């Protein structure tokens, strides 16, 4: 199985890469960052996946500056929302699986119980809305 992890330079991407490296199973993994795959450019996404085949796409990339997302709404939306939609279409076209990591910011924080994946979202800021 060929696996690509997008977002290798972020906190989550580095953590996943460290786990894969420790298990010595990285021979089927490709780790890419912004330099290799710019998620702000749909044509770049298409071009990359037209030249590379993967069975599994793990998206750890994200615009994570919560406060700055209020000012850079378009960029946050492009990376956290529109690029994910594009990756989903690419995965479907290539018959690959897609794992996308979200955030608890999609919830408003008012629940007294831990949130479940099936709970209704209610983001309270731009960052949460883009995720």
Task: Cite the ranges covered by each PLM segment.
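NAD(P)H-binding glycine-rich loop region in Rossmannoid oxidoreductase-like domains
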Residues: 42-79
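SDR active-site strand-loop-helix element
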Residues: 6, 32, 57-61, 98-103
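Adenosine-cofactor binding site in Rossmann-like domains, unifying the SAM/SAH pocket
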Residues: 25-47
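Active-site segment of SDR-like NAD(P)-dependent oxidoreductases
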Residues: 64, 104-107, 121
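Active-site Tyr-X1-5-Lys
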Residues: 122-131
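NAD(P)-cofactor binding segment of oxidoreductase domains
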Residues: 71-99
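N-terminal Rossmann NAD(P)H-binding glycine-rich loop of SDR-like oxidoreductase domains
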Residues: 2-22
């Amino acid at each position: 199985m060929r696996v690509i992890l997008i977002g290798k330079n972020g906190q989550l991407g580095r953590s996943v890469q460290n786990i894969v490296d420790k298990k010595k199973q990285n021979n089927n993994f490709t780790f890419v960052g912004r330099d290799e795959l710019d998620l702000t450019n749909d044509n770049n996404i298409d071009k990359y996946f037209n030249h590379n085949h993967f069975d599994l796409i793990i998206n750890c990339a994200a615009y994570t500056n919560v406060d700055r997302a209020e000012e850079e709404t378009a960029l946050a939306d492009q990376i956290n929302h529109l690029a994910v939609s594009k990756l989903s279409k690419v995965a479907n076209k290539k018959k690959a699986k897609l794992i996308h990591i979200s955030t608890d910011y999609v919830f408003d924080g008012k629940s007294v119980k831990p949130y479940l994946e099936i709970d209704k979202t209610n983001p309270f800021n731009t960052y949460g809305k883009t995720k």
